[in-house]
Regions:
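Transmembrane-helix motifs of polytopic, lipid-linked glycan transferases
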Residues: 85-106, 142
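Transmembrane-helix signature of polytopic, membrane-embedded enzymes
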Residues: 98-121, 291-296
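Short hydrophobic alpha-helices at membrane interfaces in multi-pass membrane enzymes
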Residues: 146-168, 197-206, 293-302, 343
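Short periplasmic/luminal acceptor-recognition loop of GT-C membrane glycosyltransferases, typified by
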Residues: 367-370, 379-453, 482-492
Length: 527
């Protein structure tokens, strides 16, 4: 009997590891939306070339993701496989954290496996490639799992780890991590004071101080300017959030546009089924005075509410469907503790909804690739990305911007050939952020992303434009740039959008493919 339990305890995590890896590997290798798909490709590679985010190029989020990707490139080689391996590993980490969280509540292995398989299906595979929002989402969930475990099971070492998770989640993406950190801090202070947990507080304080020292040491060792960090990672993103919450005309996403029945309920119906069920179960619990269960439910409800509101304010496709198995599992725990286990029907209904919704969103996001806006495209026309370079194998290339993938492949190959033959000091501005890696050359990227509405970097109308412009010109001068290449889909990246970034510099324009590919040589200005 003991050996059987041991085998189950070993076999289930192994199955989850294999499944979490393979489902993300399958999803991540189909389709491309360049601005998202390659967001951490060249930035991660640039770190290996000692060109660092914030210090040498503009980012406003994803700092930890960049360095983590650099680590994967260093350990496993600079290739697409290492890139997908990174995302698949985070999917494994999130799934295993969920598994061991549920194990604390003594649920049988079968339902835990169902919930975790659903989580692995609906979590990272919706994107498939490294994505700052999903890193922050998963690390924020892990923070919540650890906090609940620390509060209910009185484990001091977890209190020490929590501040490290704060840093990891926040420097993956500022939101939703900031809200989750605030939630945990609120409940933690209440826990320390109400229960007089001096030992818990001491471990938490030690973790806070040590993690802060490590972070400051990192800034010192990488020579990352504090001023640049504050502007790029704090002040500029605040202007984006303010615009969205205030529904300003220039905001990429407006809160007022999100407040409609279809968006609020239709897109999240399966989440809401479990959310409101758990909400009403929690209200009933107040009359039974089960403090631990009330605490669990309230923390999970507030966490999911934060994720839901944060999702509404994002310009991306929905990525929080993995809240479905999370909420379902918490309802399962409530039924079990409240002796609902005597009736099988509630559990059957839970499993049916979880399995059905998992299959539905697996088809829509992991197979049809809705996250990349290619759900209506025939995937059979996809082209092997290895035609561009063998290091992009086994990616299947198909994007929403070209009806024929071959045309986009040819455009990229022509650009690679021309840029490789140019031995001048170069800069490339593109969302095909893999040129530095494929050419094994520092191409002096300016940003991770390039949108012209103050949502990725300050443009002329933004109050921090001069800060950004100063950085651009400093990089141009320091790296002795002689020519700037622009590459994108039709009218995506035009020189007219960037020419005002440069001080007293004149250019000779050369158009290769109109509105798609051009290069601009720096020349002596004529009086």
């Amino acid at each position: 009997m003991l050996s059987k339990i041991i085998n189950i305890n070993l076999l289930t995590p192994l199955i989850l590891i294999i499944y979490s890896f393979l489902i993300n590997w399958f999803s991540g290798n189909v389709g491309v939306i360049p601005i998202d798909t390659f967001g951490f490709f060249d930035t991660g590679y640039s770190i290996l070339k000692n060109k660092l985010p914030i210090r040498d190029f503009w980012i406003f989020t994803g700092l930890f993701v960049d360095y983590l990707q650099a680590g994967f490139f260093f350990l496993f080689g600079a290739s697409w496989k290492s890139y997908i391996f990174h995302a698949s590993t985070i999917n494994i980490l999130g799934t295993l954290s969920f598994y061991y969280f549920l194990k604390n509540f003594k649920i049988n292995s079968f339902p835990i496996t169902i919930y975790c398989l659903s989580f692995a299906t609906l979590c990272y595979p919706v994107s498939g490639t490294p994505f700052a929002y999903l890193h922050s989402y998963i690390f924020s969930l892990i923070t919540i799992f650890l906090f609940i475990n620390a509060s209910l099971n009185k484990k001091n070492w977890i209190w020490f780890i929590l501040p490290y998770m704060f840093f990891v989640s926040f420097f993956s993406m500022q939101t939703p991590s900031f809200y989750i950190i605030s939630l945990v801090l609120f409940f933690s202070v209440s826990h320390f004071i109400k229960n007089n947990k001096t030992k818990n507080f001491q471990y938490f304080l030690l973790g806070s101080v040590s993690s802060l020292i490590i972070f400051l040491s990192f800034l010192f060792l990488t020579n990352t300017p504090i001023k640049s960090l504050i502007y790029q990672y704090f002040l500029f993103p605040l202007t984006i959030g303010e615009g969205r919450w205030a529904s300003e005309a220039t905001a990429y996403v407006k809160l007022s546009d999100q407040l409609n029945l279809k968006r609020f309920f239709g897109d999240f119906k399966f989440i809401h089924i479990f959310y409101f069920s758990l909400f009403f179960m929690t209200i009933k619990l107040f009359f039974k005075k089960n403090n631990d269960l009330i605490f669990l439910n309230i923390v999970i409800l507030l966490t999911c509410f934060i994720f839901f509101l944060n999702q509404l304010m994002q310009a991306n496709q929905i990525y929080i469907f993995s809240l479905i198995p999370l909420l379902a599992s918490i309802i399962h725990i409530n039924l079990k503790i409240n002796k609902g286990s005597e009736k099988i029907l509630p559990y059957v209904l839970i499993f049916i909804i979880v399995i059905f919704s998992s299959y539905k969103y697996h088809l829509r996001y992991n197979v049809e690739r809705k996250f990349l806006d290619i759900e209506k495209l025939d995937k059979k026309i996809a082209v092997e990305a290895s035609e561009i370079d063998i290091r992009l194998k086994p990616l299947k290339w198909i994007t929403p911007f070209f009806k024929k993938p071959e045309e986009e492949i040819d455009l990229i190959k022509n650009a690679l050939t021309l840029i490789k033959a140019d031995d001048r000091k170069k800069m490339i501005i593109t969302h095909y952020q893999f040129f530095s890696l494929l050419l094994n050359e520092d191409l002096n990227i300016l940003n991770r992303w390039y949108l012209w509405d103050n949502n990725t970097h300050p443009t002329e109308t933004h109050k921090y434009f001069n800060i950004y412009k100063q950085m651009v010109n400093m990089n141009l001068k320091k790296n002795r740039i002689e020519v700037i290449y622009l590459l994108g889909s039709d009218k995506e990246i035009l020189f007219s959008n960037i020419k005002n970034y440069f001080n007293n510099i004149c250019f000779k324009d050369n158009i290769i493919f109109e509105n798609k590919f051009s290069y601009h040589e720096i020349v002596t200005c004529k009086n």
